[in-house]
Amino acid sequence: MLISQNWVTELLGRSNPDWKVSPAELDSGYVRVGFETEGYSAIPETTGPLVIGRVETIEELEGFKKPIRHCFVNVGDANGTGELQSIVCGARNFQEGSYVVVSLPGAVLPGNFAISARETYGRMSAGMICSAAELGLSDKQNSGIITLPNEIAEPGTDARSIVGLDDTVFDVNITPDRGYALSARGLTRELASAFNLKFVDPAVDLNVAGVDTSDVPESSGELIKVDLRPETQARRFGVRKVSGIDPKAPTPFWMQRELMLSGQRCVNAATDVTNFVMLLLGQPMHAFDANLIKGGLVVRNALEGESFETLDHVKRTLSAEDVVISDDTGIQSLAGVMGGTTSEISDETTDVFFEAANWHPITTARTSRRHKLSTEASRRFERGVDPEIIEVALDVACALLVSIAGGSVESARTLIGSAPSMPQIRMKTSRPAELAGVAYSDATVIARLKEVGCAVEVDGDDLLVTPPTWRPDMTMSADLVEEVLRLEGLEDIPTIVPLAPVGSGLSPAQLRRRAIGHALAYSGYAEILPTPFIRNDTFDVWGLAADDERRSVVTVQNPLDAEYGVLATTLLPSMLEAVTRNVSRGQTSVNLFGLQQVSFKRGSGISPMLDVRQRPSDNEVAELLNSLPVQPLHVATVGAGFMELEGPWGHGRTYSFADAIESARVVARAAGVELNVENVEMLPWHPGRCAALKAGDHIVGYAGELHPQIVEALNLPARTCAMELDVSALPLKESFPAPVLSAFPVLHQDLALVVDESVPAESVRKVIEDAAGELLEKVELFDVYRSEALGAEKKSLAFSLEFRAQDRTLTDDECSEGRLAAAGRAAELFGATMRA
C-alpha cells in the first residue's frame, strides 16, 4: 500500500503533538511491527522560485487548435517587481480569483524541466501554472492545475510546504492475513505500537481523522428497499443518500494529494470521497447516481452467462458464482470488485447513493480472478474488511461530500445485517513466554493484546481474549502469541542455533530422482517444471471414462485461476501446453521432460486440527495422513518435430513413438530396473501406437503417439508422442551391481526376421534374448522394414546381436549357433522367417 509520511504523522500527531520522525525511523517502525516496506521515496525536488499565485485576469485566445488562455497572476514580490506575471496556460479547471501554484523563470521542475520566459501563442509567458503531475505529485498527466483554497496564503509565499512537496511516500507490503492494514487507520494503529504512542481510533473519534459529521442527521426510516439474499454470503449492506450536490464541484487539493500519493486517480468529488474513505478507514465503497437507480436493490448471484459492462468499459460475461447488485433495470455493480456504467457518477449527477457492504472474502477473490479484474476494493475484501465500520464509513462519506459539493444528507438510511460475533479464545498468560523463551510479564501480554484491539478478561492463570472485528485472522491462541511477540519485538527473542546433525548425503530415492533427470538430459530432453494445476475440463477433452483413476482430482478451494482449479494427476496436460506454446513461437522441434509429484484425492481431503501443545496420538497421525492426497513422483517426456536434426552429418529423424518408449527405458536404466512393453489402448494415446510399461507384472506407465483427435483439440504438431511413468511404483534399488568386464572381444551378428505386422517388436526381442543362449550379451532392434516384396501385413525386424564369453574368444560358429536357435524359437512362436 502506498501512503505518505505526512498523512501518517498528521493522524498520529493529533494525539501525540510532540512526535517527530524521520523517513528512516518510520521505515524501521514499520519493520519493527512486522511490515516489510518495498521502499520509500521523497517527492522529486523542485528548485528555484515556486510560489502561491492568485489569478487576476484571464483572456481567452482564439485561432488555435486547442483552447489557450492568457493569464495575469499576482505572485506578490516573488518576481522582484510586484507586477502581475504574464503566463500562457491551456488548462481549464481554474478561473479568475483562483489560488494556484506558479513556477517562475529560474525554477527547475522534476525531470530537469527548466522554466524560462518566452513568447508563445503571440503572448509573453513568464512562468507556468503547475499541475500535480508537473510537481511530481502524480504520474497522471491529465491531473489538472492545482487549485488551492482561497486566501490559503499571500501571493508570493513559497508553495513547497503548502502543497506538501516536503513529503515521503512509503510502499508498505501488506500480507494476505493483515487486510486491516490496507488503510491509514490500520497502519497508524501499528505505528503507535512501534513508537509507544497514544492511539485514538479515527473510526471512533472522527476529530482525529479531521472529519466533522455534525451535519449528518441521525438515521430514521428506511432509505431504499434492499433484498439481501442469503446465498450471496454478504454479511452487511448499507446505503445513504446525499441530495442536491454541485456535480462540477472540484475535489479539494488536500484530498487529491492523498489520493494521488496513494496511487489513486482523481475522478470527481463523489468518487474521490469513496476512495478517500477507503484509504482512511479500509472500507471500500461505491457511489451510484441515485436518479439512475430504479426501484429497490437486489443483492443476488448472477445468472450464468449474464452480461454486464463494468466502469472500465469492458463487457463481462458473468458466472453464477458472481455476486451482483441490481435494480429493476438490471445489474448496477459487480459486488466487491467494480461498479457499472449504467449508474456511474457523471457531470449531471446531483443525487448520490453511497453503498458500503461487507462481502464474503472467498467469493470476492474468485470473482476478481475469474474476470482478471483486481481492484483496490477487491484486494481489501479478499483479505477481510471490518464489518463494524460500515455506519461510520457512510457517515464520513456523506459529510465529506456535503462539505465539498454542498447538498444535504437524507435522514433515512438502509442498513441490513449485523457483524458476526468474534470467538473468545482462552490462552495461558504464560504462553508467549514459554514459546519465545523471554520473560514477558502478565501486564505486558495484556497490554499488547489490548493494543491490537482485543478485549481481555483475566480468568486465573488464563486470559479470555475476544479479537476485534477487523482481525478475522485471529482464531486460536497461537495467533495471540504471535501478536505479543510481534509487538514486543521479534528481534529481542534470543537466537539459539541448533546443532546440525551429521549429514548422511542423499537418500536412495533422491539419488534415483537425480539420476533419472541427468539421464533424460543426456538423451536430448530439456527439463521443464510442470504446473501443479490443470484445467478443469482437461479429462473431458481427453474423453476419459468417468471411473478413470486420473479423474480422482483434488479441487483447490481458492484457485489462482478459476479455469485451473484442480491439482494435476498427470504431468501431460502442463507439458502439452508447453509444447503448444513453444511451437507457436517458432520452435520446430520440442523435446521436453518433467519430473514432479502429482496428486490423487484420498478420503475426505479435510485435515483434522491437532493440538500443537502435545504429541498427536497414532490414530490422529493416521487420520491426518489419510486426509492428505497421494502424491507419487511421475516422470513424463513429450516430443514433437525432429529427434535428430538435419545437418552436414545427414538427414534428420523425426520423433516417433519408438523414441517415447526408449525414453521410458532411459528412465528404467537410470533406476536400475528392467521394463517390458506390450500393446494396449489408453487415452490420450493413439489406440494402435500405445505401449504399456511394465515393471515385473505391474503397469507403471504408458508411452506412444498421442491420439489424433487430442492432437487437433490441443493444437499440437501432428504425431506428437509422449511417455509418462510412475517413478514411485518402480522398485527402489539402493545399490547397483557392477557389470562383469571381459578381456575377450565381442562378436557381432545381425538377425532379420519377417513377422506379421501385429507382432510386437519387443516380444520378438525378448524371445531372441531368451533363446540365443548364455553367450548373448546384448540384443537391440536397429531397423524396421516394410515393402511390397515382403507381402501385405508383413514387416522385417532387424536385430543386432552381441556375443561374448568370459573365458575365451568365441568363434563365428558358436555365435551362429545361438543366432539360429533364436530364429528357430521365433519361428515357433510367431511364424517368423529369416530374411536374406
UniProtKB/Swiss-Prot annotation:
Binding site residues for Mg(2+): 473, 479, 482-483
Domain FDX-ACB: 742-835
Major site of localization recorded for this protein: cytoplasm
Keywords on record: Aminoacyl-tRNA synthetase, ATP-binding, Cytoplasm, Ligase, Magnesium, Metal-binding, Nucleotide-binding, Protein biosynthesis, RNA-binding, tRNA-binding
Record field: catalytic activity: tRNA(Phe) + L-phenylalanine + ATP = L-phenylalanyl-tRNA(Phe) + AMP + diphosphate + H(+)
Cofactor binding note from Swiss-Prot or TrEMBL: Binds 2 magnesium ions per tetramer.
SUPFAM superfamilies: Anticodon-binding domain of PheRS, Class II aaRS and biotin synthetases, Nucleic acid-binding proteins, PheT/TilS domain, Putative DNA-binding domain
Class in the EC hierarchy, top level: ligase
E.C. number(s) listed in UniProt: 6.1.1.20
Residue ranges of domain tRNA-binding in the record: 44-160
GO cellular component annotations of the record: phenylalanine-tRNA ligase complex
InterPro entries xrefs: aa-tRNA-synth_II/BPL/LPL, B3/B4_tRNA-bd, DNA-bd_dom_put_sf, Fdx_antiC-bd, Fdx_antiC-bd_sf, NA-bd_OB-fold, Phe-tRNA-ligase_IIc_bsu, Phe-tRNA-ligase_IIc_bsu_bact
HAMAP family: Phe_tRNA_synth_beta1 (MF_00283)
Subunit structure: Tetramer of two alpha and two beta subunits.
Name this polypeptide is given: Phenylalanine--tRNA ligase beta subunit
UniProt source species: Corynebacterium diphtheriae (strain ATCC 700971 / NCTC 13129 / Biotype gravis)
